Amino acid sequence: MKARRNLTPWVWAAPTILLLLVLLLWPALQLIRVSLYEGGGGQSGFGIGGSFYKPGTWTLAVYSGLASDRYFWEILSFTVWLGVVVAALCIALGYPTAHFIWQLPQRWKAAALGAVIVTKLSSLLVTIYGLKLILGDFGPVNEFLSWAGLTHAPLRLHDSATGVVIGETLLVIPYTILLIWAGLERLDKTLLAAARGLGAGSVFSFLHITLPLSLPALATATLVSLIWALGAFISPYLLGSPQELTLAVDVQRQMFENLHWPRGAAEGVGMLVTLSLLVALYAIPHRWLLRKYGMEGATA
């Protein structure tokens, strides 16, 4: 009977695990295989053996080329930089917002959460194109800055790294807010009431109760924000210049413009490896936070 109980979770999880293997692991293995083909040489034509790659070949030439390609390392560096900056901005702006929503009365909380969620109901293209107009040389932002006398010429807010950061932050921050809010909702507010009853101020209660117990949720939100930002495509593609390319954008260009599938696949593998390393490094403090505060938050 005990063995059957131990087996039950695996039985329930089996369909999901199988689905993940089919939809994630198999395409990843195919991506690795394509990266080991010889390139098609940019010839005209379409399909396997045409201009994409030469089937049946095995080579590490693409990887050795990437290792010595300064262009690739510049793109990778910008991608990581963008991920870190966007994740930091999402946490800096998202935590206070989530905390504010958490403190709202119940009747206003649903409206505030709805306002966060509604930003994800429109198409990403519509959102970014709208932002492109807002950040344009003659858009509302530059018009206001000029009217207020803060600038004498339009600021370059689009086709720049600034525009990419703003756009990607706008796309990612709703997830950050929702994840942190969900973590805060698990906290027992009677702890704060008890602290106030003992004479603790709001700042002391936040620093010694709310913040420590919300650290696991904060760590999870940071990781999710970083993963989303590292895979940025639409924001750098529409709001950046050729100097603000991410790996996701260059993969698309290599595969569909240059028709060099092995290089595009190898860059995709590089992005996957980079993301895996960052997640592995992040897992160490995250696991420590879960051990130190996660169980305490659950049992408090």
Label the model's feature ranges.
Residues 1-4, 82-117, 133, 190-192, ...:
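Transmembrane-helix boundary motif in ABC transporter permease subunits
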Residues 1-34, 100, 110-115:
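N-terminal signal-anchor/first transmembrane alpha helix
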Residues 2, 10-11, 181-192, 196, ...:
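C-terminal transmembrane helix and the adjacent membrane-cytosol boundary/short C-terminal tail
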Residues 4-9, 49, 60-71, 237-283, ...:
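Interhelical loop and adjacent transmembrane-helix boundary motif
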Residues 15-18, 24, 115-118, 170, ...:
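Transmembrane alpha-helices
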Residues 21-70, 134, 138-139, 144, ...:
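Short membrane-interfacial helix/loop motifs at transmembrane-helix boundaries
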Residues 27-31, 128, 176-179, 217-249:
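Non-cytoplasmic
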Residues 50-52, 60, 128-169, 203, ...:
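Membrane-interfacial helix termini and adjacent extracytoplasmic/periplasmic loops
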